Amino acid sequence: MELNNIKPADGAKKDKRRVGRGIGSGLGKTAGRGHKGQKSRAGGFHKVGFEGGQMPMHRRLPKRGFVSLTKGDTARVRLSDLAGVGVAEIDLLVLKQAGVVSGAAKAAKVYLAGELGKAIKLSGVAVTKGARAAIEAAGGSVAE
């Protein structure tokens, strides 16, 4: 076998049907388009979703939900990220300056992930129950 001898197996490829080439072909005259109507004519088709003038499905169904404008405003902070800040008293501004949260964040919440090796004082930042217990166990405090 060589590259110039390779060919598909017998019956693997069907010949394309040539439409509109006489009644003997089985697809002559109307060429499989039926008689009359918009779809039988050249260039005659409708836009996607068009239902012949009846109210289309995408307009019959009610709208649902909304896009929250405040969804991305609260940043999530790992407990282990607080240890790398290098400041004893931490608030939202300190977290932004340290690059722990983005500058666009309007609030932050600390959750229990990782270890906290030193005492810190947290203020103006939300805290989960587990993270609060870990901060207080390390000798730190949380002020609302």
Swiss-Prot record:
<comment type="subunit">
    <text>Part of the 50S ribosomal subunit.</text>
</comment>
<comment type="similarity">
    <text>Belongs to the universal ribosomal protein uL15 family.</text>
</comment>
<dbReference type="InterPro" id="IPR021131">
    <property type="entry name" value="Ribosomal_uL15/eL18"/>
</dbReference>
<keyword id="KW-0699">rRNA-binding</keyword>
<dbReference type="GO" id="GO:0003735">
    <property type="term" value="F:structural constituent of ribosome"/>
</dbReference>
<protein>
    <recommendedName>
        <fullName>Large ribosomal subunit protein uL15</fullName>
    </recommendedName>
</protein>
<feature type="region of interest" description="Disordered">
    <location>
        <begin position="1"/>
        <end position="57"/>
    </location>
</feature>
<feature type="compositionally biased region" description="Gly residues">
    <location>
        <begin position="21"/>
        <end position="31"/>
    </location>
</feature>
<dbReference type="GO" id="GO:0006412">
    <property type="term" value="P:translation"/>
</dbReference>
<comment type="function">
    <text>Binds to the 23S rRNA.</text>
</comment>
<dbReference type="GO" id="GO:0019843">
    <property type="term" value="F:rRNA binding"/>
</dbReference>
<dbReference type="InterPro" id="IPR030878">
    <property type="entry name" value="Ribosomal_uL15"/>
</dbReference>
<keyword id="KW-0687">Ribonucleoprotein</keyword>
<keyword id="KW-0689">Ribosomal protein</keyword>
<dbReference type="InterPro" id="IPR005749">
    <property type="entry name" value="Ribosomal_uL15_bac-type"/>
</dbReference>
<keyword id="KW-0694">RNA-binding</keyword>
<dbReference type="Pfam" id="PF00828">
    <property type="entry name" value="Ribosomal_L27A"/>
</dbReference>
<dbReference type="InterPro" id="IPR036227">
    <property type="entry name" value="Ribosomal_uL15/eL18_sf"/>
</dbReference>
<dbReference type="GO" id="GO:0022625">
    <property type="term" value="C:cytosolic large ribosomal subunit"/>
</dbReference>
